[in-house]
Amino acid sequence: MNEQRKTVVVTGASRGIGHQTARLFLDRGWQIITCSREEAPTECGRDTNWTCHIATDLGDSDSVQNFIVEANKALDGNPLHALINNAGMSPKTPYKERLGCLNGNLDAWHDVFELNFFAPLRLSRGFAGALAKGKGAIVNVTSIAGHKIHPFAGSAYSISKTAL
């Protein structure tokens, strides 16, 4: 890694907001380290600033810990300037309803909180040293559903984003 250029970690970067966020940092010359459940899109591998992508299940605490270890290895003692906790989930029940207080399996609530709340907490702690070295910032991507009732967000998602 080039310690002269700034470095960012972006979660949930294989598509959507996370992918576009990663592209924005790339366009500005930052080195990026990303993770998502899926492999990075092939066009990302062609960009020399895309330092590494680590397939990670942020809903699994062991996988999160592995990502922290591997990403810190990629940093090689260099500072981290930003952590973008973007990954999130809003599952539906088997009946295609958003997971709410009165429907769905309670284990699904655990899964939502593991990914939407505990993973960002673990990542923030896991990168605290590198962030301090780079005087970095943590950005937790939440949702309007965490602040206001939203018809397309279930209770589990909304409450987990409020907690974050």
How would you name each of these model-derived features?
Residues 5-6, 77-81, 131-144:
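Active-site loop of short-chain dehydrogenase/reductase
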Residues 55-68, 106:
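The beta1-alpha1 cofactor-binding region of Rossmann-like NAD(H)/NADP(H)-dependent oxidoreductases
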